[in-house]
């Protein structure tokens, strides 16, 4: 798993189960449940690198939609509403994508 050494598998499973229903995803509670909120800035940057699939230095809307699948291949895609809410919560400079510093701020929020 891409998060080996950063996150605990049991925490990942619990966090994914908590948002298994469509439109139940909340970034802040997910980051807390999965244990990312308590991690070091370095570990948060490593997590960002996993989510940034195209290695552009940003997490774009299409990568956010598939966010949960970074934690488990069988996880659902986020709904359009969840994706837009996630982007709005993390995109503090309004450029339509989430940079590493914005991601770290969202995780720690």
UniProtKB/Swiss-Prot annotation:
The modification N-acetylalanine is found at residue 2. SMART domains: EFh. GO terms for cellular component: cytoplasm. InterPro entries: EF-hand-dom_pair, EF_Hand_1_Ca_BS, EF_hand_dom, Parvalbumin. Ca(2+) 2 binds at residues 91, 93, 95, 97, 102. GO terms for molecular function: calcium ion binding. The keyword Acetylation applies. Residues 39-74, 78-109 form the EF-hand domain. Coiled coil: none annotated. Ca(2+) 1 binds at residues 52, 54, 56, 58, 60, 63. Pfam families: EF-hand_7. Keywords: Acetylation, Calcium, Metal-binding, Muscle protein, Repeat. PANTHER family: PARVALBUMIN (PTHR11653:SF12), PARVALBUMIN ALPHA (PTHR11653). In muscle, parvalbumin is thought to be involved in relaxation after contraction. It binds two calcium ions. Belongs to the parvalbumin family. This parvalbumin has an isoelectric point of 4.47. This is Parvalbumin alpha.
């Amino acid at each position: 798993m891409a998060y080996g050494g950063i996150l605990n598998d049991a925490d990942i499973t619990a966090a994914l189960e908590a948002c298994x229903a469509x439109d139940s995803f909340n970034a802040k509670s997910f980051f807390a449940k999965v244990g990312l909120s308590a991690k070091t800035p370095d570990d948060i940057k490593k997590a960002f690198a996993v989510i940034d699939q195209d290695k552009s230095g940003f997490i774009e809307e299409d990568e956010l939609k598939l966010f949960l699948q970074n934690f488990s291949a069988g996880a659902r895609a986020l709904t359009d509403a969840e994706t837009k809410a996630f982007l709005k919560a993390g995109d503090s400079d309004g450029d339509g994508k989430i940079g590493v510093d914005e991601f770290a701020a969202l995780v720690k929020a």
